[in-house]
């Protein structure tokens, strides 16, 4: 879904940072997120993703730089940001002793939605997210997937222009994950921008744009296709029955950046673009010397997981 014609970006951050004592949790982050876009925010634990979300929501004051969210300054216009954004935390943050309906009505009141407007919005969202039959159940008794759905409904009660979702499908089974994503696409089609953190790389492929955080820095961003393109012609697949021995041998081949195991297939990463047919001989020689002869050698299309692992490996090596 493309942005509304002439619409300003929903997030504009320039040099944003947050320091806790001697720790730079987020450093010099500059970012734009377009209207009506699903933006995937990736990175390992401790990379600064949640800290970034809290700053953009106005929940945590930056110690450097500045940002505007839906047109409002994050340091001085918290109330305006709250009225136009929703936030769903990574952990279940609703009231377990209240029913599903009571939780929704409570958050509706927090956002200034009362009476018939709240009832109408609840009917609308509960039908879409399949919570209708659970209205009277205590929230603490819901399954993980249903808790996530209720949290999402509460974040949407006031029809926000932008919603921050911190790991919205964590701990949810694949079928429930698919339902959540179907709903997120429908939200985006209806005009809501989404800022999503996730550890699931297949989910990142569903986003219109993604950014990768490492050690508090945004080190790459773009469309999933453009991000994968950074590894184009640099990933080669190898069949190996003795996968562990072959992996160790291939890591010593000049030009090889890393090797990972996927069953009887090895994914061989090169520092520069290569032709699989050209490098096959050097790979076979190294593996045969180690007593782990190879089967087929073939080019592989890179994935976001490949890129994620490459960035993480470089970050670890740089420390």
Where are these predicted regions, by residue range?
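Short, charged/small-residue-rich alpha-helical element at the C-terminal edge
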Residues: 232-314
């Amino acid at each position: 879904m493309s942005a509304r014609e002439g619409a300003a970006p929903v997030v504009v951050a320039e040099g944003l940072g947050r320091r806790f004592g001697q720790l730079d949790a987020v450093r010099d982050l500059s970012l734009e997120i377009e209207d009506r876009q699903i933006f995937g925010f990736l990175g390992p634990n401790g990379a600064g993703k949640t800290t970034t979300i809290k700053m953009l929501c106005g929940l945590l004051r930056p110690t450097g730089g500045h940002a505007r969210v839906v047109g409002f300054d994050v340091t001085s216009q918290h109330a305006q940001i709250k009225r136009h954004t929703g936030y769903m935390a990574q952990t279940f943050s609703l009231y377990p002793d209240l029913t599903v309906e009571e939780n929704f009505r409570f958050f509706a009141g927090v956002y200034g939605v009362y009476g018939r407007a709240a009832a109408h919005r609840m009917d609308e969202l509960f039908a879409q997210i399949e919570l209708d039959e659970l209205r009277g159940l205590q929230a603490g008794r819901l399954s993980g997937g249903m808790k996530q759905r209720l949290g999402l409904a509460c974040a949407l009660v006031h029809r926000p222009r932008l919603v921050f979702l911190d790991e919205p499908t964590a701990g949810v089974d694949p079928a429930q994950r698919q339902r959540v994503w179907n709903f997120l696409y429908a939200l985006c089609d209806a005009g809501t921008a989404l800022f999503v953190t996730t550890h699931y790389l297949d989910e990142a492929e569903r986003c219109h744009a993604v950014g990768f955080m490492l050690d508090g820095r945004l080190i790459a961003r773009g469309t999933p296709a453009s991000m994968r393109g950074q590894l184009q012609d640099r990933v080669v697949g190898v069949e190996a029955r003795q996968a562990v021995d072959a992996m160790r041998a291939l890591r010593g081949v000049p030009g090889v950046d890393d090797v990972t195991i996927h069953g009887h297939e090895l994914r061989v990463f090169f520092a520069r673009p290569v032709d699989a047919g050209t490098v096959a001989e050097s790979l076979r020689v190294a593996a045969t010397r180690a007593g782990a002869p190879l089967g087929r050698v073939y080019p592989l299309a890179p994935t976001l997981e490949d890129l994620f692992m490459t960035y993480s490996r470089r970050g670890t090596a740089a420390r």
